[in-house]
């Protein structure tokens, strides 16, 4: 190992630490908040379910959204892209749900309404509560299908092929939201790096008057 393992080579303490920590992102913003909350104590999971498992009508959900409540869509990525409630956030239950919630939802006391696949509402509430987000006020009754059937406005996230991207992407208006190590390994020329985990902290670097890919 001393002959082949770089970590056991002739490194100073400073060189060793630098070698092991290069490229490592800071801890997600919710870590410190969750640690502080751990000292105070959380609501029991039974209390969380009692306050969160409230079926809400479309009108109740939209009224809450207008008052600053986050509508969180937890369906599959493709389903969200094909159609979702305007201004809804997306974090899919089928991926790393809890870590992404912790990285992207800055306020741990943010009131939330869940839009989930039928039968997945309680799972979403439980997984949010596990990382400290226990202020879910309800879920949309009937899910997105009920909303779509109501005829109300929907939003979509269009996707394009690499060929379409190459032909039409405006120079300097490409956002790369991967991790710095992935960006450094290979990226689209002139793409702007804004790692998704910390996008909230750098929104002032995005020109809101321009379209981005």
Regions found by a protein language model. Give the residues of each.
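Short loop/helix-cap segments at secondary-structure boundaries that form the rim of catalytic
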Residues: 80-86, 183-189, 206
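Accessory terminal helices/loops
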Residues: 1-113, 117-135
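Structural scaffold elements adjacent to functional motifs in cytosolic proteins
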Residues: 72-73, 174-176
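Helix-loop module immediately N-terminal to the HCX5R catalytic loop
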Residues: 92-111, 190-212
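Tandem CBS (Bateman) regulatory domains
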Residues: 143-146, 153-159
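Short glycine-rich anion-binding loops that position phosphate/pyrophosphate groups of nucleotides
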Residues: 77, 179-182
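Short beta-strand/turn micro-motifs composed of small residues
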Residues: 115-116, 176-178
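A short glycine-rich beta-strand->turn/loop micro-motif centered on a GG-aromatic cluster
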Residues: 133-147
């Amino acid at each position: 190992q001393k002959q082949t393992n770089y970590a056991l080579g002739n490194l100073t303490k400073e060189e060793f630490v630098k070698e092991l920590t290069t490229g490592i992102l800071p801890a997600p913003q919710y870590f410190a908040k969750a640690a502080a909350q751990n000292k105070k104590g959380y609501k029991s999971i039974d209390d969380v379910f009692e306050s969160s498992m409230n079926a809400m009508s479309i009108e109740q959900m939209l009224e809450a959204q207008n008052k600053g409540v986050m509508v969180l869509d937890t369906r599959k990525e493709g389903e969200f892209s094909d159609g979702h409630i305007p201004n809804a956030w997306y974090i899919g239950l089928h991926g790393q749900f809890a870590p992404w919630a912790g990285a992207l939802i800055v306020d741990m006391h943010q009131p939330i309404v869940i839009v989930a696949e039928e039968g997945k509402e309680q799972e979403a509430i439980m997984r949010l509560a596990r990382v400290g987000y226990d202020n879910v006020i309800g879920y949309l009754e009937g899910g997105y299908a009920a909303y779509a059937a109501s005829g109300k406005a929907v939003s979509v996230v269009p996707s394009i092929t690499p060929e379409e991207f190459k032909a039409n992407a405006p120079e300097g208006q490409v956002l790369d939201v991967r991790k710095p190590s992935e960006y450094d390994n290979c990226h689209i020329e002139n793409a702007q790096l804004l790692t998704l985990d910390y996008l909230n902290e750098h929104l002032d670097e995005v020109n809101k008057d321009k379209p981005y890919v």
